[in-house]
């Protein structure tokens, strides 16, 4: 699996220390193991997890500004766990409403020795944080409108950002953004061996 990861990282132009590579592989191994009982992801093949979960998450890293982030609706820890591994100097709160997912994430945190994550079982609209976050990240979580509605209280004002990971560019959603939200950028992401488009939408308060 290390050979496959190295190959993907090379194509993506990403350089990581060996420890982070081993942590990423350890995460995939745990996800594969727990998935059989917990049904955490529809991706069953660990090699495909490297593409569709690991690379698909860490290509976002260069675009994140700040040091405190929350991954809302993290599911089995995506993109929060891979990002926390490759960005050990930042802090990530991983939030999900399902107990079985949070139990899995506790095991990941313990086995990989991740001390820069905090795990929260809660609905996003019921969760508050002080201080607020530099960035609110979501992947396959909801429409932009729902994300902004449910998470409006989480980023620092005015400099905090919303980072939404999408497939095809969501022009219909971008056309109806609230007046107090500014579209900062739409970034086309290149994920090696991944079929289909990937876009990162970056929004901030006006």
UniProtKB/Swiss-Prot annotation:
Transmembrane segments: none
Sorted UniProt keywords: Cytoplasm, Methyltransferase, rRNA processing, S-adenosyl-L-methionine, Transferase
Classification via SUPFAM superfamilies: S-adenosyl-L-methionine-dependent methyltransferases
S-adenosyl-L-methionine listed as a keyword: yes
Reactions the enzyme catalyzes: guanosine(527) in 16S rRNA + S-adenosyl-L-methionine = N(7)-methylguanosine(527) in 16S rRNA + S-adenosyl-L-homocysteine
EC number in record: 2.1.1.170
Database matches in InterPro entries: rRNA_ssu_MeTfrase_G (IPR003682), SAM-dependent_MTases_sf (IPR029063)
Localisation per UniProt entry: Cytoplasm
Binding site for S-adenosyl-L-methionine: 73, 78, 124-125, 139
A Pfam family per the record: GidB
GO molecular function terms attached to this record: rRNA (guanine-N7-)-methyltransferase activity
Stretches assigned to coiled coil: none
CDD domains xrefs: AdoMet_MTases
Gene Ontology CC: cytosol
Family, similarity comment: Belongs to the methyltransferase superfamily. RNA methyltransferase RsmG family.
Reported function: Specifically methylates the N7 position of guanine in position 527 of 16S rRNA.
Name recorded for this polypeptide: Ribosomal RNA small subunit methyltransferase G
Organism of derivation: Yersinia pseudotuberculosis serotype O:3 (strain YPIII)
């Amino acid at each position: 699996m290390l050979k496959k990861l190295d190959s993907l990282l090379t194509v993506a132009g990403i350089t990581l220390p060996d420890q982070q590579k081993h942590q990423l592989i350890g995460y995939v191994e745990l996800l594969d193991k727990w998935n059989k009982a917990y049904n955490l992801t529809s991706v069953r093949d660990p090699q495909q997890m490297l593409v569709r979960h690991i690379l698909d998450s860490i290509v976002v890293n260069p675009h994140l500004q700040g040091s405190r982030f929350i991954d809302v609706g993290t599911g089995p820890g995506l993109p929060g766990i891979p990002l926390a591994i490759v960005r050990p100097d930042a802090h990530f709160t991983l939030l999900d409403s399902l107990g079985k997912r949070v139990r899995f994430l506790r095991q990941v945190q313990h086995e990989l020795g991740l001390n820069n994550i905090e795990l929260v079982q809660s609905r996003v609209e019921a969760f508050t944080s002080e201080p607020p976050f530099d960035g609110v990240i979501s992947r396959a979580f909801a429409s932009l409108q729902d994300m902004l509605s449910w998470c409006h209280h989480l980023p620092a004002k005015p400099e905090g950002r919303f980072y939404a990971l999408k497939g095809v560019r969501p022009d219909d959603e971008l056309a109806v953004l609230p007046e107090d939200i500014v579209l900062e950028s739409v970034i086309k992401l290149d994920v090696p061996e991944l079929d289909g488009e990937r876009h990162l939408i970056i929004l901030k308060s006006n």
